[in-house]
Curated annotation (Swiss-Prot):
<feature type="transmembrane region" description="Helical; Name=1">
    <location>
        <begin position="9"/>
        <end position="29"/>
    </location>
</feature>
<keyword id="KW-0812">Transmembrane</keyword>
<dbReference type="GO" id="GO:0009555">
    <property type="term" value="P:pollen development"/>
</dbReference>
<comment type="subunit">
    <text>Forms homooligomers and/or heterooligomers.</text>
</comment>
<keyword id="KW-1003">Cell membrane</keyword>
<feature type="topological domain" description="Cytoplasmic">
    <location>
        <begin position="93"/>
        <end position="103"/>
    </location>
</feature>
<feature type="topological domain" description="Extracellular">
    <location>
        <begin position="66"/>
        <end position="71"/>
    </location>
</feature>
<feature type="transmembrane region" description="Helical; Name=5">
    <location>
        <begin position="131"/>
        <end position="151"/>
    </location>
</feature>
<comment type="similarity">
    <text>Belongs to the SWEET sugar transporter family.</text>
</comment>
<feature type="transmembrane region" description="Helical; Name=7">
    <location>
        <begin position="191"/>
        <end position="211"/>
    </location>
</feature>
<keyword id="KW-1133">Transmembrane helix</keyword>
<feature type="topological domain" description="Cytoplasmic">
    <location>
        <begin position="212"/>
        <end position="265"/>
    </location>
</feature>
<keyword id="KW-0813">Transport</keyword>
<dbReference type="InterPro" id="IPR047664">
    <property type="entry name" value="SWEET"/>
</dbReference>
<feature type="topological domain" description="Extracellular">
    <location>
        <begin position="186"/>
        <end position="190"/>
    </location>
</feature>
<feature type="topological domain" description="Cytoplasmic">
    <location>
        <begin position="30"/>
        <end position="44"/>
    </location>
</feature>
<dbReference type="InterPro" id="IPR004316">
    <property type="entry name" value="SWEET_rpt"/>
</dbReference>
Amino acid sequence: MAQLRADDLSFIFGLLGNIVSFMVFLAPVPTFYKIYKRKSSEGYQAIPYMVALFSAGLLLYYAYLRKNAYLIVSINGFGCAIELTYISLFLFYAPRKSKIFTGWLMLLELGALGMVMPITYLLAEGSHRVMIVGWICAAINVAVFAAPLSIMRQVIKTKSVEFMPFTLSLFLTLCATMWFFYGFFKKDFYIAFPNILGFLFGIVQMLLYFVYKDSKRIDDEKSDPVREATKSKEGVEIIINIEDDNSDNALQSMEKDFSRLRTSK
């Protein structure tokens, strides 16, 4: 059996990294479907998607400077497109305050990209330019993996994993593993190093999910539904669950239920 060379292994892990990264980019689809159904982005944050967009844009530039980094180009080109889609959906359904905040972040992001690219291209050359952009990419990638920290804090505070899907945490961990080995065999420190932290953050997120995954369900059973019990003529207990977020609608629903009970006597 022929022994695989480092180039072969880097290609294999890069290809696997593309596949898993593709799934990572698509993992928030259920979240945005929920936003679409609710017609509201309240409770969700755009920051992780903004940071991911910035990272994908910088990595495209880094791949251009390194040459022959087609596997980095392919996935980050797709990443830019999908993150822009997510951010657009978020802005469409976000409350006014969130729209303004996200808009300022977008302007800041575009301004940062507009500074990094021309400055490094004009003021640095060759390997020195690659090194500068590589360090910037490494720092941003660390921020990408650290972005869910705010969501992790929210999970601990609310004891709910609603805003931290398990599939996203799982694929982030797998993604970090694949790209670490790609960078390792490619001898690309700027790709390998951030993914060590990415792997660790992913493990912590999955542990938090298993710790708190049943907490919200228990809390809901204890406090959220308005439960009223009454007895029919036959002595059978009838439970009326009202889970409407709007209190007026809940009261109207309760009145209708009791009306049905009265007319059935």
